[in-house]
């Protein structure tokens, strides 16, 4: 049976409202911070309280079980006879007071394993393996402040020691030969599409309400965009921040938003990469359980929705630590893991290796890291993942003006590359690729207001043209659906 795709729109960078909490510290001085610090949850659940006093907390009203995978921040804590208690915000919403014992303290969390392909032209930065680091209060510390016994690993396996204050950890970084992993580009390109132009740079428009004329308010009606048989319908309006907003976090680790770069959807779990700046290579992954989050609109208003609704949403939204994501546009996922090609989009081409991250969906932490190369003088900017052992990559060969499609298959820690197709032309002459995915035997390549459908061998099939005038920030194919993320 011939399979067709239905389009689904994921819209990002919308408004999250303001909520002012009324929970108090009574008769005790609080240690306050000018800007919020980021806290890292532990594995044990603790009660959350309305109030604290010198004698301890009172007014228990909920548990941390709903919030431990969210973005947790705080601007103050108090010392009581029962220990320190922190006044926490979760995903940008004021929640209440919790014991400092809830946070993981004096801890360095690292990837479970790292396998580096031997390459004298590239050195793996060992701090890229850090999930998070915490001090004695459970406050997150910037990975750059961690001392390492070796900053880079390139051609020989090494055990690297990490330390910050009382926190210590070590990691064996394996270097494999990479023999037989790289492929050769030897396929004849298929005829391509007629080249078109589009607008360049940032979005030229916005959703209905996210503009000055409507005072940057939340969306209340969905969108439908049609082209050449492809129909895109809104599935979710994301919150602008999944944290406190502009200027409220003490550093880049705290703010989750506002720049989306890539998406992946698998089994109803939608994940996007979020950055504070387009120049950052570290950021956060945010996962939404669409099986539980049925509303298209409610997630925009995490800070103002009913408390019972917020608890449910908080349990179904997960935020990763502040980790290396590279450009963050190339994502994929399986039932258990999220995959990221953590490449450098400012590096045009050359002999450098690239990083693949495997991140657990369960706790949003890095499980494995591999570095790889697909072929001589080919650096990948766009990729997608199918299951746990397959990556498809897109490479634009400027010298020959064609796109190459590569399949990388994992066996153990080796990623073996094979060219599977090629297409003549650049498709859009004045805009970079904004999204790339694979589904039902076809590649989908997104540019601003354009999506191209290409057979696995490079056969040009369909060109979808839109007039949305908002940046596409990632594509993902899952089942019969094609998911498209629009900014603004």
What does each model-identified segment do?
Residues 137-180:
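Serine/threonine-rich, repeat-prone extracellular segments and beta-strand-based repeat modules
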Residues 31-54, 106-140:
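Solvent-exposed, low-complexity, repeat-rich "mucin-like" stalks and linkers
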Residues 185-254, 266-316, 351:
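Beta-propeller domains
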Residues 1-28:
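Sec-dependent N-terminal signal peptides of Gram-positive bacterial secreted proteins and lipoproteins
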């Amino acid at each position: 049976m011939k399979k067709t795709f239905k389009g689904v729109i994921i819209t990002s960078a919308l408004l999250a409202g303001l909520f002012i909490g009324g929970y108090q510290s009574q008769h005790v001085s609080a240690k306050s911070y000018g800007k919020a610090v980021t806290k890292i949850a532990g594995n044990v659940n603790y009660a959350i309280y309305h109030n604290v006093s010198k004698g301890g907390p009172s007014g228990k009203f909920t548990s941390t079980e709903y919030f431990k995978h969210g973005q947790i921040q705080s601007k103050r804590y108090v010392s009581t006879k029962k220990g320190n208690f922190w006044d926490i915000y979760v995903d940008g919403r004021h929640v209440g007071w919790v014991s400092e014992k809830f946070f993981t303290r004096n801890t360095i969390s690292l990837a479970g394993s790292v396998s580096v392909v031997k390459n004298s032209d590239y050195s793996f930065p060992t701090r890229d393996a850090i999930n998070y680091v915490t001090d004695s209060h459970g406050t997150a510390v910037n990975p750059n402040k961690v001392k390492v016994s070796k900053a880079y690993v390139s051609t020989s396996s090494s055990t690297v020691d990490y330390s910050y204050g009382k926190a210590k950890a070590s990691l064996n970084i394996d270097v494999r030969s990479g023999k037989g992993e790289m492929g050769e580009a030897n396929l004849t390109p298929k005829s391509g599409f007629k080249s078109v132009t589009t607008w360049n740079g940032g979005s030229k428009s916005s959703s209905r309400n996210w503009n000055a004329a409507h005072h940057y308010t939340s969306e209340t009606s969905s969108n439908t965009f049609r082209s050449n048989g492809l129909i895109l319908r809104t599935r979710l309006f994301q919150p602008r921040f999944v944290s406190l907003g502009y200027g409220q976090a003490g550093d880049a680790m705290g703010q989750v938003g506002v720049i989306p770069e890539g998406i992946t959807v698998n089994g109803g779990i939608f994940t996007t990469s979020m950055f504070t700046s387009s120049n950052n290579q570290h950021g956060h992954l945010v996962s939404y359980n669409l099986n539980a989050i049925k509303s298209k609109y409610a997630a925009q208003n995490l800070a103002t929705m009913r408390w019972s609704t917020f608890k449910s949403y908080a349990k179904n939204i997960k935020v990763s630590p502040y980790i290396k994501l590279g450009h963050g546009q190339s994502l994929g996922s399986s039932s258990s893991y999220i995959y990221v090609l953590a490449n450098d989009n400012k590096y045009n081409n050359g002999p450098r290796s690239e990083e693949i991250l495997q991140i657990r969906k369960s706790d949003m932490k890095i499980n494995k890291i591999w570095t790889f190369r697909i072929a001589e003088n080919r650096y990948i900017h766009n990729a997608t993942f199918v299951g746990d052992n397959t990556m498809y990559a897109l490479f634009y060969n400027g010298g020959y003006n064609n796109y190459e499609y590569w399949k990388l298959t994992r066996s153990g820690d080796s990623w073996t590359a094979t060219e599977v197709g090629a297409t003549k032309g650049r498709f859009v002459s004045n805009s970079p690729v904004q999204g790339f995915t694979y589904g039902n035997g076809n590649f989908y390549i997104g540019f601003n207001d354009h999506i191209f459908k290409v057979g696995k061998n490079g056969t040009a099939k369909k060109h979808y043209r839109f007039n949305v005038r908002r940046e596409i920030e990632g594509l993902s194919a899952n089942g019969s659906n094609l998911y498209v993320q629009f900014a603004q």
